[in-house]
């Protein structure tokens, strides 16, 4: 990835203001600001094939995820991924049972069990499709912000994105869900990927990170005011 946010000038400034906006109180704002000032992005640059839409989207997603987890110190929640893995595991279980049962009881003796396993497998695949379409959607990160006092439930931050095929417009959406009120707010931007990659296909974090920080700060500031 690109050079550190503090060395990038404007990235460092954005990090400082992010800490002030997202702090729970005046006392913790200064310490959080200092933490963000020291934060830096991994020095290893991300270089991809600019014509590979999946690689472009994945690199932008991973970098946005890195900002929330490393800059703002949020804790990732793997609930969505665990749900998908559970469904896939159950599906594989039915496939394995069918294989073993057919080996132990050759067809046609195994026919009833095979039919049950095949039907169950396709039912689980249907459940997986519904889960990814309506539950996961395009969310690639769910992160929790712990309440400093430990009295209120965790605030939840979600990142989702989209990049249509043969389109250069990348959309990143950040969703904030208050742990105390359960109110949900969203902020997003849609920009050309050309703004974030140089001619060689290297992701320019000095251009990308401030956009993510602005999304976060707009929601964090609104949360603090309310």
From Swiss-Prot:
It comes from the Eukaryota. The keyword ATP-binding does not apply. The modification N-acetylalanine is found at residue 2. Residues 9-25 have a biased composition (Gly residues). Residues 108-111 are lumenal. Pfam families: SPC25 (PF06703). Residues 1-37 are annotated as: Disordered. Its main location: endoplasmic reticulum. The chain crosses the membrane at residues 87-107, 112-132. The keyword Calcium does not apply. The modification N6-acetyllysine is found at residues 169, 191. Keywords: Acetylation, Endoplasmic reticulum, Membrane, Transmembrane, Transmembrane helix. GO terms for biological process: signal peptide processing. It is found in: Endoplasmic reticulum membrane. Component of the signal peptidase complex (SPC) which catalyzes the cleavage of N-terminal signal sequences from nascent proteins as they are translocated into the lumen of the endoplasmic reticulum. Enhances the enzymatic activity of SPC and facilitates the interactions between different components of the translocation site. Component of the signal peptidase complex paralog A (SPC-A) composed of a catalytic subunit SEC11A and three accessory subunits SPCS1, SPCS2 and SPCS3. Component of the signal peptidase complex paralog C (SPC-C) composed of a catalytic subunit SEC11C and three accessory subunits SPCS1, SPCS2 and SPCS3. Within the complex, interacts with SEC11A or SEC11C and SPCS1. The complex induces a local thinning of the ER membrane which is used to measure the length of the signal peptide (SP) h-region of protein substrates. This is Signal peptidase complex subunit 2. It comes from Mus musculus.
């Amino acid at each position: 990835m690109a050079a550190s946010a503090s060395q990038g000038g404007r990235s460092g400034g954005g990090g400082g203001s992010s800490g002030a906006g997202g702090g729970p109180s005046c006392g913790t704002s200064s310490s959080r600001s200092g933490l963000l000032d020291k934060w830096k992005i991994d020095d290893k640059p991300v270089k991809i094939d600019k014509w590979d839409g999946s690689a472009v989207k994945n690199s932008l997603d991973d970098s946005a995820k890195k900002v929330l987890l490393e800059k703002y110190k949020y804790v990732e929640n793997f609930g969505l991924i665990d749900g998908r893995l559970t469904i896939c595991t159950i599906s594989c279980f039915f496939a394995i049972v069918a294989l073993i049962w057919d080996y132990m009881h050759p067809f046609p003796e195994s026919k009833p069990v095979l039919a049950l396993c095949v039907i169950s497998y396709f039912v689980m695949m249907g459940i997986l499709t519904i889960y990814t379409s309506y539950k996961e959607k395009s969310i690639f990160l769910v992160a929790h912000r712990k309440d400093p006092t430990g009295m209120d439930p965790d605030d939840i931050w979600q990142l989702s994105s989209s990049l249509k095929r043969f389109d250069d417009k990348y959309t990143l959406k950040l969703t904030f869900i208050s742990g105390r009120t359960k109110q949900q707010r969203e902020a997003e931007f849609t920009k050309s990927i050309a703004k974030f990659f140089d001619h060689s296909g290297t992701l320019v974090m000095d251009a990308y990170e401030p956009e993510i920080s602005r999304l976060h700060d707009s929601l964090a500031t609104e949360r603090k005011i309310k």
